Amino acid sequence: MSDMRKPSNVRISRWLQRTPVDTFGMCPLLISPSIKPSRRDLLFLAGGAALVSVAGGPHHARAQTAGADKLKIATIGAGREGGALGALLVKAGHPVMFSSRHPEQLKDMVTGLGPLAKASTVAEAVAFGDVVLLVVPYTAVAEIGKEHGTGLAQKKLVIDVSNPIARRDGEDFVKQVDAEGGAGLATQKALPGAHIVRAFNAINFDQLAELAHRQGEPAVPIAGDDKDALALATTLIKEIGLEPVMVGGLAMGKYLVWGGPFTGVHTPAQVKEIASTLK
């Protein structure tokens, strides 16, 4: 039986097994068949399979067509978080172009998500998208700004999902980001002129599918200074079945990080209460 005729989770698992680490894409670790998978590895596999399940599976995806009013979405980074977010946007009817340094390694993922999903280089994705999701290790943000800053400044919205993480990026780097005002202001400095909103920074990638359209209004804290960009981010987040909650300007972006006060699943009221205690 060919890969295309196998269940979607089998194809995605094979994709995960043969996809190496990618600096921009943050792809899952290579899992050798000769090595017994750890619990963390199995979580990676579950997260990868969810990329197809949140889009309704390949049979559902083939029937999808983008409406004339649907914005084109690009992801810079197509690993766990970028893949999960992009899949939800595909399900909402948006054409999504996933990008990485090695777009050929994304073939199985985009095939499983259906005709609205494409894979490309970062440059092609930036040219394609009306909205860009920035989902990379935070150390790559400055480099992306140098290479693609002009193009990103022309977009309606750049959603900054990237986080500075000490264990990955180094303690000195995180201190440098903090000295620049934290994530958010540091992203704006790296991408001058871009219409930036920080969002999805404190939610586990493997929670996204189960939270979408769930009762109880699971909240997504957002921060930004651009009124139009915030309005657009609000619309997109609602489209994928989550509830955006404004917590302040980009200066509040320093709190929208994994391990920060907004980490986990909260109701809108809880997010507002947490935000009221912060400066």
Model-inferred region functions:
Residues H148-K155, L191, R214:
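Short, conserved loop/helix-junction motifs that constitute active-site signature segments
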Residues S2-R5, V10-R11, F24:
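Intrinsically disordered, low-complexity segments enriched in serine/proline and basic residues
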Residues G67-K70, K91-V131, V135-G151:
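Conserved N-terminal Rossmann-fold NAD(P) cofactor-binding segment
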